[in-house]
Amino acid sequence: MTMTPQHPGMPDEQRSVEEHMALSSLFTTLEDLTAWSRKHSLWPFNFGLSCCYVEQVTVLTPVYDQARFGAEVIRASPRQADLLVVSGTVFHKMAAPLLRLYEQMRAPRWVIAMGACACSGGMYDIYSVVQGVDRFIPVDVYIPGCPPRPEAVLDALIMLQQQVGSERRPLGVTVGNTAGLGFDAPRRRDQRRDERMAQTLLDPPESL
């Protein structure tokens, strides 16, 4: 909240302490101030695995200028970052290193899944590809596309900033059981896997 002086034209010597504070101070809550500072100072850590990362790097160019949103400083270490951007195809061999990097990030932390492969496995419905990065880490914003355009990345960043600005997180966050948050829910593509695989079983020539 802010304090509005009742007599803006009054001489300084006639103003009360409250009047002086209203002219030079802004009052707010610690939670709002913390959320505002986090919103305008995201520290991203990019985890690029495939062609989507090319579009993600394009956002850093002067044409799109990601620096306008306070997220231009790419961190080289997850210990210095609070935003993890996963772009590209996540193979099962990469799941464990990616989870380790996520666990090294300081809380609070956020995750953006960029591209169809990071969101749901994309067209790689095979044994070696994780069908969505949210299988092992929570995702805050999904960016569909193969690959997404740079404008979509900026839209996702703005959407995440709105979410961060409205959160009321303390300075430290303890994540409890996530069983009820839908991370372990069965995927529709997994439920229909047998049905789709049956379509590849053709009738033998002698039956025609």
Swiss-Prot record:
Coiled coil ranges: none
Protein name: NADH-quinone oxidoreductase subunit B 2
Catalyses which reaction(s): a quinone + NADH + 5 H(+)(in) = a quinol + NAD(+) + 4 H(+)(out)
Annotated stretches, region: Disordered: 182-208
Known EC number: 7.1.1.-
Keywords on record: 4Fe-4S, Cell inner membrane, Cell membrane, Iron, Iron-sulfur, Membrane, Metal-binding, NAD, Quinone, Translocase, Transport, Ubiquinone
Cofactor annotation remark: Binds 1 [4Fe-4S] cluster.
Biased composition (Basic and acidic residues): 185-197
PROSITE patterns, A to Z: COMPLEX1_20K
InterPro entries, sorted: NADH_UbQ_OxRdtase-like_20kDa, NADH_UQ_OxRdtase_20Kd_su
CC cofactor: [4Fe-4S] cluster
Membrane topology (UniProt): Peripheral membrane protein
Residue numbers binding [4Fe-4S] cluster: 51-52, 117, 146
Complex formation: NDH-1 is composed of 14 different subunits. Subunits NuoB, C, D, E, F, and G constitute the peripheral sector of the complex.
Listed HAMAP family: NDH1_NuoB
Organism this protein belongs to: Rhodopseudomonas palustris (strain TIE-1)
Entry's localization field: Cell inner membrane
GO MF annotation terms: 4 iron, 4 sulfur cluster binding; iron ion binding; NADH dehydrogenase (ubiquinone) activity; NADH:ubiquinone reductase (non-electrogenic) activity; quinone binding
GO cellular component, one term: plasma membrane
Gene Ontology BP term (one): electron transport coupled proton transport
Enzyme class: translocase
Family assignment from sequence similarity: Belongs to the complex I 20 kDa subunit family.
Described purpose of this protein according to its UniProt entry: NDH-1 shuttles electrons from NADH, via FMN and iron-sulfur (Fe-S) centers, to quinones in the respiratory chain. The immediate electron acceptor for the enzyme in this species is believed to be ubiquinone. Couples the redox reaction to proton translocation (for every two electrons transferred, four hydrogen ions are translocated across the cytoplasmic membrane), and thus conserves the redox energy in a proton gradient.
Pfam annotation, one family: Oxidored_q6
Keyword 4Fe-4S: yes
UniProt main location, coarse: membrane
